[in-house]
Amino acid sequence: MLAPKKVKFRKWQKGRLRGPALRGISIAYGDIALKSTEHGKLTSQQIEAARIAMMRHIKRGGKVWIRVFPDHPITAKPLETRQGSGKGSPVGWCAPVKPGRILYEIKGVNIDLAREALIRAAHKLPVKTVIVLKERL
C-alpha cells in the first residue's frame, strides 16, 4: 500500500477541505481519466482496491497512473478507551481530495474497456466521480 517514506510530524490536525481543486485537474498522461466531483479522503487501502479492480479488468494491456498519494496521517484511539489523554496513534494514511481532482488515468486500451475499468474503480471509492476524456486538439 502507498505511504510516505518520511514525514515531518507523526500526527497532523484533520484540517478541512474547502473549494475546488486547483492542481491535478487536467489529464497529463492517459487518454481517459476518473475525476472526483466532491470532497473526501481516500485511504491507501481504497486507492489500492480501486487500482486492483482496474488492473483485473484491463488484464495485461494498457497503463494506469495513480494521480493521488496518501500523505495525510489518520490517527485512532484503541477500542473501549475513554476520551482524553491525548491524540491517538497513527493507524494509516489518506489523500485529501477536492472536486475536480484527477484520481486515475488509463492509456493504451480500448476506450470502452477503459471506461468499464474506471466504473469498477469508482465503486471502490467513497467520493462521487465522473469519467473524462482527453480533449484532442
Swiss-Prot record:
Subunit and interaction comment: Part of the 50S ribosomal subunit.
Function according to Swiss-Prot or TrEMBL: Binds 23S rRNA and is also seen to make contacts with the A and possibly P site tRNAs.
UniProt entry tagged with the keyword Ribonucleoprotein: yes
Provenance organism: Lawsonia intracellularis (strain PHE/MN1-00)
Keyword Ribosomal protein tagged: yes
Family matches, as Pfam families: Ribosomal_L16
A Gene Ontology biological process term: translation
PROSITE patterns: RIBOSOMAL_L16_1
Record's keyword terms, sorted: Ribonucleoprotein, Ribosomal protein, RNA-binding, rRNA-binding, tRNA-binding
Gene designation: rplP
Family stated for the protein in its record: Belongs to the universal ribosomal protein uL16 family.
Listed name of the protein: Large ribosomal subunit protein uL16
Domain of life, per lineage: Bacteria
SUPFAM superfamilies: Ribosomal protein L16p/L10e
NCBIfam families in the record: rplP_bact (TIGR01164)
GO MF entries: rRNA binding; structural constituent of ribosome; tRNA binding
Assigned GO CC terms: cytosolic large ribosomal subunit
